[in-house]
Every structure is written in C-alpha cells, then in structure tokens.
Swiss-Prot record:
Gene3D superfamilies (alphabetical): 3.30.300.10, 3.40.50.880, HUPs (3.40.50.620)
Name of this protein: GMP synthase [glutamine-hydrolyzing]
Annotated binding of ATP, by residue: 229-235
Species assigned in the record: Ruegeria pomeroyi (strain ATCC 700808 / DSM 15171 / DSS-3)
Enzyme's top EC category: ligase
GO cellular component terms given for this protein: cytosol
Quaternary structure and interacting proteins, as annotated: Homodimer.
NCBIfam families: guaA_Cterm, guaA_Nterm, PRK00074.1
GO function terms (MF aspect): ATP binding; GMP synthase activity
SUPFAM superfamilies the record matches: Adenine nucleotide alpha hydrolases-like, Class I glutamine amidotransferase-like, GMP synthetase C-terminal dimerisation domain
Amino acid sequence: MSQTSHDRLLIIDFGSQVTQLIARRLRELNVYCEIHPYQNVTMDFVREMAPRAVIFSGGPDSVTREGSPRAPQEIFDYGVPILGICYGQQTMMTQLGGRVESGHGTAEFGRAYVTPKGTLDILDGWFTDGREQVWMSHGDHVAEIAPGFEVYGTSPGAPFAITADTSRHFYAVQFHPEVHHTPNGAKLYENFVRLAGFKGDWTMGAYREEMIRTIREQVGDKKVICGLSGGVDSSVAAILIHEAIGDQLTCVFVDHGLLRKNEATEVVGMFRDNYNIQLIHADESDLFLGELDGQSDPETKRKIIGKLFIDVFQKHADTIEGAEFLAQGTLYPDVIESVSFSGGPSVTIKSHHNVGGLPEKMGLKLVEPLRELFKDEVRALGRELGLPQSFIGRHPFPGPGLAIRCPGEITREKLEILREADAIYIDQIRKHGLYDEIWQAFVAILPVRTVGVMGDGRTYDYACALRAVTSVDGMTADYYPFTHEFLGETATRIINEVKGINRCTYDITSKPPGTIEWE
C-alpha cells in the first residue's frame, strides 16, 4: 500500500479483465487509486488505507454461485461512496438484500443503449440525446434491487442498468463505463469522484516532489545501482533518482550487441553529457553473440540473454563499493500482475527478460520509484523531468533486443542488415508524420533467402517483414493500415539501400492470434 499523502480511492478487484482501465480513467482525473484483489481486502486493510471512496470491479464469476467473491460486509457501513460495476453491482445488490438471477434471456454482451429513468447526480452530462451507448458483458442480471435503491436507467437486457441509494451515496451500474465502447464513461467517473470530494491533486509535479523525498528517506547516504536499458521506464527512474541523491547513483548500461542503430552511443551520450549521471558502459556484445551462436529456438535465446544479463550486470555492479540498493523501473501493472487474482498458474507465452532475480542474488534492497504509475504517467513524469518528447514517445523495445526480431540463428551479418533496414523504416514513418500514431514498429529479418533481380544480375538475399501496430496497452493490437504508396516507397528504399535484402513483406496479423514481436 502506498504511503502517499493524497486522497485515495480503493478499487476492489473481482477479476475483470478491464479492471486496470478503471484505474487509468481515475488517474486521468488526477485521482490516486489502488487496485487490490477482493480476497486481500479486509476491514482492517480498509481502515488502514482510509479511502475516500470505493469501486467494485466487474468479474467473471456468478454471484448466484455459492462461495462466489464478496466485498467485506462492513464496508457498506464505512461511510464512503461506493460504485459497483457489472459483477460489482450484482454483489452489492446481493449483499444489501437484493436478488440476482442467472441468464433466462437477459444476457447482454457488447454494445447496448441505456435510457434514463429520473435524474441522478452521478449522471450529470449523460442522456443529452435521450439515451446513452454503453458496453455490456453480463449473463446474470439484477432481478430485485436492494432496499433503499431506486432505478435511474434501463436497457433491454438490464431493467436495473443504473441504480442508486442516494442517501448513502451507493451507485451501481450493469455496464462497463471504463471501456472505450462506453463513449461517455469518463464523465460518470468524473461525477463520482467529484461527489466523493476528491481534490484532483494527483499530478506528476506533486508525485515528483513526493518521490524525491521518499527516495532520500529510503536511501539515506547509501549508494544505488540502476540497470539502464535506454528505454523510457529505466531512464525516467534513473533521472528521478539522480535528482534525489545525485552521485550516490551509478547506472550500468549493458550493451549486448542487440541494440538498434547508434542506440548505445545515443544512450551513453544523453546520460553522461546531458544529465551528468555516473554510468558504466558494459560492452559485452562479443560475450552475448558468442553464447547465442548456433541457437535458433526463441525460448533458448531469451533464457541465454536473461542469464547473461544478470551475470554481466552483477559483475559490473560488484565494482561499485558500498551499494545497498538496486533501482528498477517497475510499473504499476507489474505490481498488479504479481498479485494474481486467482493465484492459479497461467501459460507462459514468452519468458520475460528482466532483472527480477538480482535483488536477492546480490543482497540488495529495491528502489522502485515508478511502481505506482502506469506507462502514460511515466511519460508524463518524463516530461516533468525535462526529457525530450522524441525520447519519451519512443516505441517499446524488448529487453532481448534484435534477437527476437531475427528468427532462427543470429549472426553479426544479419544483425547489421536488420539495423539498417529498421533505421530506414522508422525514418520513413517519421517523415510521413505517422510515428506517434503507432504503438510499435520494427523490421524482422526472416530466416529465408529469396531470388531477386537487380540490374542484370541475380540476387539471393534475405526477405524481411515490416511490422507496425496500434494498441492502448500492448495486451491487444491491430496492424497499422499503411497506404500502398507508403509500403511501396519504404520497400523500395530498403531493397535499394540495404545490401542483403531483396524482398519486403508487411505483417498484417493482429494480437491475438499473433504476438507483436516475432519471437
């Protein structure tokens, strides 16, 4: 639980896949909130957190099932506004004396329209056209509202789509206001936090000052090591920590030989020259590429890179005397996902490359100044710290680097070809003003050679795939709809300017079923 001095809002998570979107909508309103799984929320926890308001999330379970998730019964006597969403509405009704039934032709999945029934303060700004589009996802439905509640909105499948007990400031909706498919959902959240009395003072300027104080109190006069990747998260974390403790921070930048064109030079230059941060540049490309020689299985490549990264980082970190802390760019979604809702195992899609085992292995304590932030908030904090937009807005880049954009065996020749092709592709995207519209774009060099003709000669070179996707959070993604003219112009440049490629393709696979990266 955060020690922030700001007003808090507690989101009790009943397992919805979009619970994080609730938190994001609230953060956009400058309201500090935390997500906690229902099984961890006791009244002692609630009293310690002292939230100004509570939201019950949706969830996949049925409140009609014996033993299904519930909120602490006493929370309804705690005296703060409560908003129940989908399953959250249903458990609120059940726990307060209403009744929920399963199915029977009233299930709703997808777009629906709610019509008003009376006026309600939380619906200020709604129903300007007589009805409101919302996103439904429910099999069960409220059959009888709890005592004290009244109906304020209905839909064909949910006669109690919006209900409220205004005397206790309890509100309950059957739909999901947090998703984009409920176009006016943000207004509902805005009304709720206003009625709850939030000041809207959760800003990155305030967070910066608060976190600097926290880092100084935590670290004292001890030294901190930070693994710098050159990405936005680790860079913002490093600059914030450096602002707090100055030369007590040393960054270790491990160059595994799998970076993009000129990336190592740019990262080292920015942090040494612009920010005067003590930096160890560990060029270990020969070691990494040597260990990867002959390896083609993607999981094997990831594991080799992950293990070597930890070994190399530790070797260089051991040269820093008196270091007691390790800084990491952990974000709030990482924190949420580490506390599993169900506690059950999940299928490993891909191994994640990080330094998760380092603190215990090195006997270091963690400094995680971004652990309360979402990605968009990290970028806002970066702007607050003076990082240029060209850096803050960079597309995500995987820890294993170009290794997972080079299916099959990795060679220095293929990496050089890939760097050049990727640089041209990104240059094309920037020239056409498309970079900020795209979540991630890159080139993958394919493990196949094709026959081509250049001039009067025959070529037998590699094919490459261009990849560009749009996404909100990387969990799902759609391919970017480039024009044929753009793709033709880009393919021509790559084939003409990069020796070793004679064919370009464009990957139009969405996620799911594909992943964003090729490996």
